[in-house]
């Protein structure tokens, strides 16, 4: 059967050449190769039946083996050469992917850092924005909520495009777009707060392209523990970029004496990163790391993809758990620096800011803690998952559940400690964020396990939409709204500014506990859904010999 396949693939009269070569070999007393196949030019020599690898010459059209004198050289196609080497011979990876995978992952991670740096630069100068535009907590929370709303609406669109068109071009265009909008927003006059809100919405559209598509490229470059490691690096960019956003916003504001300059740093870096993605990130094939040498069949329709994802219980529960994480991180990231500033005003260790520029110490400290806990959390989560995989195949969702439930305890303690000790509050923030950030990369790895390659961009997009819709799209505004609502029924004082925001933020740990429950539900269905995905991948793969060129 192998001879028939190879003969049909060879060009011009391969069957006749095969018959002539066989007759000549029999006259010389030669035996067929050790692979048991007498085709494809894989001829035994002197009865040994082995041809060394250095006797094969690669050409643009295929490969040709050098044959000792007296034996004719028979050209072979790449598929035939692979068959001659035997079933145990590894398939060579494309050179473009083999050399540039690490660099591509690093550039994509850098782009993710910039996305979150830009997103949380606004939070780093939030008090200045409130004083400059004259808005209360509700208006300040609207900036983040509008950003997330546009982000989640655009995410499914980019997920559809990412499964069907050139992904790195979409990434670069998204970065160029949000960089231009962010830079322009730094020139908005004081009386046009609505323009700043609109600009944040447009930035959300640009950043949606990146967060939706970039993880799927990494998923197509690596597999198994290596993919977990690379996704850990990529998702470490979330807390790192968030922390750098606070630090950049407050530091640039202090250096320039004007908070507007904080919005002019990330656009320059974004333009550079977008260019690097266009030049250095390889155009990987979807499912390259999973298809084991075959080629994926034609992809399914968008409607069929959506139906399959909705029926995937591990995907649904992990998406709901991710929504709880987004709710907490969105609310805490937006309001904790301001909450700690108000705590110090109550403790009379700081003064109320009535005009910008305001103090930046809390944003700097919180940013530094976020950067370090992000690194520690991602590394701890990935390491704990690898260790637990040796003991249970449900390690991924179980580690996430433990991290979420432990984080909820320390988030509660933040509001208890802040009343008397800012240092104690920072310690609780450190532990709580470390546990909360431990599930970023693991959640992405769960998605890669239970979703087939041709649906991953759509799956990431739908998960982003769901997590933002139920999470940080409304949590910053909701916390600000509750805070203002409580203050309306009390006297206007620094104490009630502090207490009202703290009471509103107490909603976060309860949502985090709910997320931990969703991860436990994911663990119930993880193994069966992963097995289904592996079976579907095998059905989608066409063996190389059957692929028409």
Swiss-Prot record:
InterPro entries xrefs: MFS, MFS_dom, MFS_spinster-like, MFS_trans_sf
Tissue: Expression is high in the lungs and liver, low in the lymph nodes, spleen and bone marrow, and very low but detectable in the thymus. Not expressed in red blood cells. Also expressed in the inner ear: expressed in the cochlea, both in the lateral wall and organ of Corti.
Main location: membrane
Transmembrane stretches, start-end: 141-161, 169-189, 202-222, 229-249, 261-281, 320-340, 364-384, 398-418, 422-442, 466-486, 507-527
Effect of loss of the gene: Deficient mice are viable, do not exhibit cardiac defects or embryonic lethality, and are generally normal and fertile. Deficient mice have decreased levels of sphingosine 1-phosphate (S1P) and dihydro-S1P in blood, accompanied by increases in very long chain ceramide species, and have defective lymphocyte trafficking. S1P levels are increased in lymph from deficient mice as well as in specific tissues, including lymph nodes, and interstitial fluid. Moreover, these mice have aberrant lymphatic sinus that appeared collapsed, with reduced numbers of lymphocytes.
Keyword Ribonucleoprotein listed: no
Record localization: Cell membrane; Endosome membrane
Keyword Transcription: no
Keyword set, alphabetical order: Cell membrane, Deafness, Endosome, Lipid transport, Membrane, Non-syndromic deafness, Transmembrane, Transmembrane helix, Transport
GO cellular-component term (any): endosome membrane
Pfam family, one: MFS_1
GO MF annotation terms: sphingolipid transporter activity; transmembrane transporter activity
One GO-annotated biological process of the protein: bone development
Chain segments carrying region Disordered: 14-36, 78-97
Membrane topology summary: Multi-pass membrane protein
SUPFAM superfamilies listed in its UniProt record: MFS general substrate transporter
Catalytic activity: sphing-4-enine 1-phosphate(in) = sphing-4-enine 1-phosphate(out); sphinganine 1-phosphate(in) = sphinganine 1-phosphate(out)
PANTHER family recorded: SPHINGOSINE-1-PHOSPHATE TRANSPORTER SPNS2, SPINSTER
Homology family: Belongs to the major facilitator superfamily. Spinster (TC 2.A.1.49) family.
Entry protein name: Sphingosine-1-phosphate transporter SPNS2
Organism: Mus musculus (Mouse)
Record lineage: Eukaryota, Metazoa, Chordata, Craniata, Vertebrata
């Amino acid at each position: 059967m192998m001879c028939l396949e190879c003969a049909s693939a060879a060009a011009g009269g391969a069957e006749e050449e095969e018959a002539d070569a066989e007759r000549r070999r029999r006259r010389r007393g030669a035996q067929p190769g050790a692979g048991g196949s007498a085709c494809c030019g894989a001829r035994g020599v002197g009865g040994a039946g082995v041809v060394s690898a250095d006797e094969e010459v690669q050409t643009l059209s295929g490969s040709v083996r050098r044959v000792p004198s007296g034996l004719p050289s028979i050209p072979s196609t790449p598929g035939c050469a692979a068959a001659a080497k035997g079933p145990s011979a590894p398939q060579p990876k494309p050179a473009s992917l083999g050399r540039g995978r690490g660099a591509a992952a690093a550039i994509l991670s850098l782009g993710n850092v910039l996305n979150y740096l830009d997103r949380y630069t606004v939070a780093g100068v939030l008090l200045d924005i409130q004083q400059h535009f004259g808005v209360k907590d509700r208006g300040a929370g609207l900036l983040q909520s509008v950003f997330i709303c546009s982000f989640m609406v655009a995410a499914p669109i980019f997920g559809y495009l990412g499964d069907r068109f050139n992904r790195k071009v979409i990434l670069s265009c998204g970065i160029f777009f949000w960089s231009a909008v962010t830079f322009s927003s730094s020139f908005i006059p004081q009386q046009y707060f609505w323009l700043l809100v609109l600009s944040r919405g447009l930035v959300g559209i640009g950043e949606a392209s990146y967060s939706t598509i970039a993880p799927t490229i990494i998923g197509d470059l690596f597999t198994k523990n290596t993919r977990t490691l690379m996704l850990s690096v990529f998702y470490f960019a979330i807390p790192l970029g968030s922390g750098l956003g606070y630090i950049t916003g407050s530091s640039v504001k202090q250096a320039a004496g004007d908070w507007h300059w904080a919005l002019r740093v990330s656009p320059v870096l974004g333009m550079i990163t977008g260019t690097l993605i266009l030049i250095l990130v390889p155009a990987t094939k979807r499912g390259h790391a999973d298809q084991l040498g075959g080629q994926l069949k034609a992809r399914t329709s968008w409607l069929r993809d959506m139906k399959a994802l909705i029926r995937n219980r591990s995907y649904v529960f992990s998406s709901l758990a991710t929504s709880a994480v987004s709710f907490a991180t969105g609310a805490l990231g937006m309001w904790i620096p301001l909450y700690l500033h108000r705590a110090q005003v109550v403790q009379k260790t700081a003064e109320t800011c009535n005009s910008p520029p305001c103090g930046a110490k809390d944003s700097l400290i919180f940013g530094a803690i976020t950067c370090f806990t992000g690194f520690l959390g991602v590394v701890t989560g990935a390491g704990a998952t690898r260790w637990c995989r040796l003991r249970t195949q449900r390690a991924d969702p179980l580690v996430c559940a433990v991290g979420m439930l432990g984080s909820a305890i320390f988030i509660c303690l933040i509001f208890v400690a802040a009343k008397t000790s800012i240092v104690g509050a920072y310690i609780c923030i450190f532990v709580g964020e470390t546990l909360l950030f431990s599930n970023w990369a693991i959640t992405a790895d769960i998605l890669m396990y239970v979703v087939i390659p041709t649906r991953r961009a759509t799956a990431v997009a739908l998960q982003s939409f769901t997590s933002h819709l139920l999470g940080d799209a409304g949590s910053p505004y909701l916390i600000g709204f509750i805070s203002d609502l409580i203050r309306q029924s009390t006297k206007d004082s620094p104490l009630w500014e502090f207490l009202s925001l703290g009471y509103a933020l107490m909603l976060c740990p309860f949502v985090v506990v709910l997320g931990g429950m969703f991860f436990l539900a994911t663990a119930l269905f993880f193994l069966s859904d992963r097995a289904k995905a592996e079976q579907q991948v095998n059905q989608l793969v066409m063996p190389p010999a059957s692929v028409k060129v």
